[in-house]
């Protein structure tokens, strides 16, 4: 299966021919991906809205998880 979006050969993290991450790359895109690496745990990737807390990167994924408010 695809590891990354192989639509653009300009993406330095993704091999456009194979749709696989290039050697050494952890990710190709996402709010918690920077220069082919996961952003460190605790970095804010989405600011708080209303009563919800800031969403923070996990350090293990390129996706920005949604933190849910618990009353």
From Swiss-Prot:
This is Disintegrin tzabcanin. PANTHER family: ADAM A DISINTEGRIN AND METALLOPROTEASE DOMAIN, DISINTEGRIN AND METALLOPROTEINASE DOMAIN-CONTAINING PROTEIN 28. GO terms for biological process: cell adhesion. The disintegrin belongs to the medium disintegrin subfamily. Residues 1-71 form the Disintegrin domain. It comes from Crotalus tzabcan. InterPro entries: Disintegrin_CS, Disintegrin_dom, Disintegrin_dom_sf. It is found in: Secreted. Gene3D superfamilies: Disintegrin domain. Its main location: secreted. Keywords: Cell adhesion, Cell adhesion impairing toxin, Disulfide bond, Hemostasis impairing toxin, Platelet aggregation inhibiting toxin, Secreted, Toxin. It holds the Pfam family Disintegrin. Disulfide bonds join 4-19, 6-14, 13-36, 27-33, 32-57, 45-64. One of its GO terms (cellular component) is plasma membrane. SUPFAM superfamilies: Blood coagulation inhibitor (disintegrin). GO terms for molecular function: toxin activity. Belongs to the venom metalloproteinase (M12B) family. P-II subfamily. P-IIa sub-subfamily. Inhibits fibrinogen interaction with platelets. Acts by binding to alpha-IIb/beta-3 (ITGA2B/ITGB3) on the platelet surface and inhibits aggregation induced by ADP, thrombin, platelet-activating factor and collagen. Inhibits cell adhesion to vitronectin, probably by blocking its receptor integrin alpha-V/beta-3 (ITGAV/ITGB3), and to fibronectin in vitro. Shows little to no cytotoxicity in vitro. The keyword Disulfide bond applies. Expressed by the venom gland. A motif (Cell attachment site) lies at residues 49-51.
